[in-house]
Amino acid sequence: MSNKDIRVVVGMSGGVDSSVTAYLLKEQGYDVIGIFMKNWDDTDENGVCTATEDYNDVIAVCNQIGIPYYAVNFEEQYWDKVFTYFLDEYKKGRTPNPDVMCNKEIKFKAFLEHALKLGADYVATGHYARIRRHDDGHVEMLRGVDNNKDQTYFLNQLSQEQLSKVMFPIGDIEKSEVRRIAEEQNLATAKKKDSTGICFIGERNFKEFLSHYLPAQSGEMLTLNGKKMGQHSGLMYYTIGQRHGLGIGGDGDPWFVVGKNLNDNVLYVEQGFHHDALYSDYLIASDYSFVNPSEIDLEKGFECTAKFRYRQKDTKVYVQRENENSIRVTFAEPVRAITPGQAVVFYNQEVCLGGATIDDVYKNEGQLSYVV
């Protein structure tokens, strides 16, 4: 089958990465369709309206490269699967990662299903990751060539079934090369700056945004020994290891968030970047997913490396089953500021094995006061 007989539906955001993705596939002779996903009703807020502007950029790029385009509305699915999860996690005192859930439920589920109905053989996105396809049909997900842009951390929940239908055309090139191609082809998005922040918040003030949906309750800010250091403005606004916004003056080392007590509405703080309370030996995680589950033996356990946040250096870990729903991840050496609600993502060199959601963090068999 030649490329012209293979239909690839590209998820286009109005950014340079997805624009170049569509361009490269068209150049390679595929039957390409561009789709703009509308996941958030920006008329809900008084924030900056970017969706219309982004869709106009998609239209401009698709017209330039000569492919058809559509807009598809996934607002309902996004609210049900991503945004309610996001709010529920904050209510529990955790720090969620909505990008992971968005990839799992929207971009590679709702969007993939929609694309297949359009006769797609594959979907493609502008993620910095790679797919390795084997002769027996199974696939592996590899880190993007541009180490600084690698996005496998956010794709850790994708299954074998999902990844077998996915292409990541820019995963093999550096971001600078993506920009160069866009400028060389004079694409409408060539000079557009990369978006930052959570997809549905955009450039808005996070604290203000969250306050629209969750009532904040101020409370005491204490050291672990009970010394009062001030007031916090709502536990949901703080994350483990946070330094800024505490309002603690005085001399000496800066202060950091080391824990939360939801029942008493207390925020725990301690002084010093390397304070003992910020370090842990192992964690318990749930909602684990592996790209090739048949190759993973949780009963026996296995060694690999892991990331606990995006762009963090890999840490050597040992992974084993804790119980029916959870895994235990033990670190080769103590790790600082691991945060419940975030993803732990596993790697074997350049291969991303999968990931899980961090629930509890321990030191010397004792649970840290991260969320009590």
UniProtKB/Swiss-Prot annotation:
It comes from the Bacteria. GO terms for biological process: tRNA wobble position uridine thiolation. It is found in: Cytoplasm. Residues 149-151, 309-310 are annotated as: Interaction with tRNA. Its EC number is 2.8.1.13. ATP binds at G11, M12, S13, G14, G15, V16, D17, S18, M37, G126. The record marks H127, Q342 as: Interaction with tRNA. Keywords: ATP-binding, Cytoplasm, Disulfide bond, Nucleotide-binding, RNA-binding, Transferase, tRNA processing, tRNA-binding. GO terms for cellular component: cytoplasm. It is an enzyme of class 2 (transferase). Residues 97-99 are annotated as: Interaction with target base in tRNA. InterPro entries: MnmA-like, MnmA-like_C, MnmA-like_central, MnmA-like_central_sf, Rossmann-like_a/b/a_fold. Disulfide bonds join C102-C199. Catalyzes the 2-thiolation of uridine at the wobble position (U34) of tRNA, leading to the formation of s(2)U34. Belongs to the MnmA/TRMU family. This is tRNA-specific 2-thiouridylase MnmA. It comes from Staphylococcus epidermidis (strain ATCC 35984 / DSM 28319 / BCRC 17069 / CCUG 31568 / BM 3577 / RP62A).
